[in-house]
Every structure is written in structure tokens, then in C-alpha cells.
Amino acid sequence: MAATDFIVAIELGSTEITGIAGKKNADGSIRILAYASERSSDCIKKGAIYNLDKTTQCLTSVIKELEETLHAPIRKVYVGIGGLSVRSIRNTESKQLGEDTKISQALIDSIMQSNREIPLIDREILAVEPQEYKVGNNLLTEPVGVPADYIEGHFLNIIARHSLKSNIKQCFKQTGYEVADYFLSPLVTANVVLSDSERRSGCALIDFGANTTTVSVYKNNILRHLAVIPLGSENITQDICSMHFEEEEGEQLKLRFGSAYTELSDNDEETNRSYNLDGRCTIPARQLEDIVEARVNEIITNVWNQIMVSGYGDKLLGGVVFTGGMTNLPNLDKAFTHITKIEKIRIAKSSEISLEGDIELPQDGTQNTLIGILASGKENCCRIDPRKGVQLSFTEDLQQKEAEAKRKEEERKLKEEEERRQAEEAERRHRIEEEKKRQEEERAMKRQKEYESYMETGPKACWEKRIIRQLFRKLNMQEP
């Protein structure tokens, strides 16, 4: 039986584009109805689209596969936004008030609007996280109703390049599917991975991706810092491949033998051992360990630097939470503790939301953002026939789409024909004007020549010659 009430979520990852359809239950759990994925490494890098056409093809393929599983047409989807250019910046807006003015919601809204209007070069604000409001000597999160003569709002703005969102819009416009809403990927991931206690006590959420690592710092249930580091698990694979291995071999060596942290050993057997990949390639164990650990240490050092930059490095009572595909690398938590001295670490390979249904998602930390997008969606994404007020069947929807595509193609051809006709008419008029101009110039030149000839041979010219002749005679001079 076809599903007619569901939510669809799409995540644009650097290794694959994933799509999911599900239905929310009354108890807060989600029933998974469909799942699809397509490789995206040749069209998305570090979370940003760089090939619009290939991304459009991948998106179309993913959504079509979801439709086939659902046996129902999809009208719109919810999309996650992330990537290297996403980061947080702090801003302060203040307003002088009359004496003992009661702060209203309208006043708070106006301060927030002023914050959104700050000038940014090649950037746009994707989300705003109010930090607190300074009223008198107090810092409040909910200042409405408090009398004051001055208020100062502190905001954390999440910004990104204009092209990040505009490229996504272009791709979905080409697919013919609507975007119900855009969600900031780090925020929705935190919604389904972090507990209320962790958010309140203070914690750092580290999402280890393929091309990027995202750092989100929370305290008192408020996002305090967000940064994206341009390093991920794929960098480890590339480092291994630099030892003259194919990419697939490097990935397999990492997955089968890689470790983020290894205890030093003086045992000769341990020192001289090697790793063999099904007889295809061999690498000394110590060499592989050094390669993996060096890159992991670099990533963790950058992560820790961002946590310290946030100003909350010593306030993370809730510890650190890991998620993302790189969490499958053994001893990642030990490596983090070795560098940062933080021991309270939790690895979240699945979300806090209960999932049900016949479709089982990978429990490796790679699907948490997708689940977060799905959980944040609210509207039914099934296509509805506006004439009947009911959901179209999959076949009817395909027929309607084909008819619509045919109509648009005919309109396009008519438009092109009209443009061609107008261009030909404009060209014809141009040629006529040019011919008129040429003929007018020829007539003008002819009149000029006739005038010059007249001046040389006409009556006036003859009279002038007689006067000159008589003058020469009177002066007894020989005519020239």
C-alpha cells in the first residue's frame, strides 16, 4: 500500500547524497519508510556543491528511488546545509531606552532585526542564536517584561558563503522538486545526538566527516561556538595512498588496520610486523600507524583549538560527544584524551530518537544528520492533486509530470520561435534602415558634386571670370 503522509529529508554529503522518508509517531519515534543514497565525491567537496549538473542528477536519482519505494510521488523535501564556509561570529546590538521602559517582544524583535542587517561581504546569515541580553548589570536570556533604560543584545550569527545555499537552490530548481525548508546541519545533528543534560552542563559535539570536521560548543542549552575544519577521514586515506597505493586500497587499509592511537611497544615482533591486504599489497605496521596517528593528531589539535577559542574549554562538564563516520576508527577517544586530557567522551553512532520500520540504517554515526533533518521537518511532503484534494498515485504523478514537461517544452519551442521571428524582423528592419541611409548618403554626395560643378561652370562663375579679365587688362597685366 502506498504511503500518503510522510516527511522527506536530504543530506548533501561530500561522499554521498542521502535521502530518507519517514513518518512521525505520537510517542516521538519515527517510522522509516524509504532510504536511498548516491555517491557524490565528484560533485560535492567539503560540503559545498561544485558541479551543479552532476549534483542535480544525483538528487533526482535519490528522490526517484525514494518514490519507487514509497509507491507515491514526492512534492517537496527538507534539506540540510553544512560545509566548510559555515562558521559562527559574535555581534552585539544595543538600544537606549526611556527611564524604566518595560522591555517588550517588539523591542527584542527590532534588536534582532538590527543584528540580521549587519553588513557582510559575500556571506549571508543562515541562523541566529541569541546568547543573552544585558539589562542593567544582569545577563538575561528572557528579558521581556523587565523595566530598563538600556538593553544590550549578544548574538551568535551562523554565516556561510552566498553560493552555498544558492547552488542548492539551483540544483533543486532543475530537479523540479520543491524545498520545504533548509536546516543547518550541525544544529539538527545536535538535536538528535545530545541529551538535555549535556547541552545544559556544557559540551562539545564533534562531527568527524569525510572532508570536514564540525565543532559545536554548547552551554546552558545555548550554542556558543560553531566552526568547520577542512580536515576529515578522507585525508587519512589520501595520506596512505601517498605510499603508492590505489585509493580503494588506502581506504581498506585504513578501515581494516587503522588506529587513531597505539601504545608504544619495544617488542621486536610488534615492531617488524606488517599488514597485508588479501595478498594485493603490504605495508609495515609501524608505518601505517604513524601515518594514521599523525593525521588524527592534526585533526584533534585543530578541534581542541576551536574549543579553546570558544572560551568554554574549561566549562565542558558534559564532556565531548563524537559522531560521524570517522568515529569508526579504533581508539579515537584515546587519541583525543591523550592530546586534550579530556576523559569524558561519548561516541554517538546512532541518534537519541527511536527508529522503527523494516529499513535498517547503518549504525555507524553517518546517518545522524539525516535523521536530524527528518526529525525537524513538519509538513507532509507527498504530492497532492490540487483538483481532487487527494494524493496522486505514482503512475498518475508520472503522467502528470510528463504532461507538464511536454507543455513546458511546447512553450519553450513557441517562445524560441517567437524570439527567432522577432530577431529576423529586427534584422530585416535594420537592413532597410541601412539601405535608406546608404541611398541618402549617395543622394547627398550627388547634390554636392552638382553644386561644385555649378559653381565652376555656372553663370556666377562666368561673371567672376569676366571681372578678373577686365581687371588684368586695366592693369596691363597678362592673364595667368
Where are these regions (language model features)?
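Glycine-rich phosphate-binding loops at beta-strand->alpha-helix junctions
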Residues: 259-261, 316-337
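ATP-binding/phosphotransfer module of carbohydrate and carboxylate kinases, centering on a glycine-rich
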Residues: 310-311, 331-344
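Nucleotide/phosphate-binding catalytic cleft detector across ATP-hydrolyzing
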Residues: 1-16, 20-203, 260, 384-480
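Phosphate-binding glycine-rich/basic clefts of nucleotide- and phosphate-handling proteins
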Residues: 68-69, 83, 126-128, 135, ...
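Glycine-rich phosphate-binding/hydrolytic loop that grips phosphoryl groups
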Residues: 348-397
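Short glycine-rich phosphate-binding loop at a beta-alpha junction
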Residues: 72-83, 310-325
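A short acidic Gly-Thr/Ser loop motif
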Residues: 10-16, 81-82, 205-212, 218-221, ...
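Residue-level signature of catalytic and energy-coupling elements of molecular machines
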Residues: 9-10, 19, 79, 172, ...
